[in-house]
Amino acid sequence: MLTIKKLIIIAIAILFAISSAAQNIKKAEWSKVKMDSSWESLAEQGKESKSTKIINKYKPAVDELNVVIGEAAKDLPAHSPESELSNFAVDAIREFADKWLSQQGIEAKTDMAVTNFGGIRLSNFPKGDITIAQVMACFPFDNRIVILDMPGKYIRQMLQAFARRGRVEALSGVELYIKANKVERFRIAGEPLKDDKIYKVATIDFLANGGDNVYSFKNAVGMTNTNVQIKDMIIDKIKALTAEGKKVDPKVDGRVKIEK
């Protein structure tokens, strides 16, 4: 769990970033606050130091970040080609996208999901209590979940690019086997990939716009933006598991295999 000082820094940084974006700011004011024993001496005199005022001002935001929302059953590493944490994140994206489509009255389901390892900023999510602050540290970017209508031939193109560079992003709903930097076998939604079929792919807007060199997604024939950020979705997913009496306990299932 993050310490109170670290959480204060996070909260102040977030709030400062928000306020700095406002158009009506004309002047920034600041002053030095000594981080020494004068804190305690002022408290003994019944006076409130400047640092205490700062802490009290941001304490509600810090307390909210430090709320425990769930529990990890074990350490959850994140690494390519697949891992417990990446599988949890990308499977959650696909599950969320299916529910979102249903809520919009759309009967179709997603065929696969993709997210990038670069967007998962913790190499290992520790076993034990999970706080909102930890989720935000793991998924700090404002990436929103989108649903693409993708021709199969461009999905194949993307997978071939993954194979050539020797690094696969996190995948859900697929079985992929790469050997000697070539795609030897690929199944999507349990079936062989068809180049002329349109597939629904859940991902994040960063990748949909060609981020991390995933240029194939720019050939989508349709894109729907859910306007839900991945970190908010992950927080809701963990809360839902907790409400069901479950821990976060994803598995590595061999969905992606790579041989040299």
Give the positions of each predicted feature.
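Short, functionally important structural connectors and interaction interfaces within domains
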Residues: 17, 68, 77-80, 142, ...
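N-terminal targeting signals for Sec/Tat export/insertion, comprising classic cleavable signal peptides
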Residues: 32-64
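Acidic/histidine-rich, surface-exposed loop or edge segments in extracytoplasmic proteins
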Residues: 63-80, 214-220
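Feature captures C-terminal
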Residues: 24-41, 87-260
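Mature, extracytoplasmic segments of signal peptide-bearing proteins
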Residues: 79-88
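Bacterial Sec-dependent N-terminal signal peptides
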Residues: 1-30
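Short, flexible segments with low predicted structural confidence
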Residues: 60, 64-66, 126-130
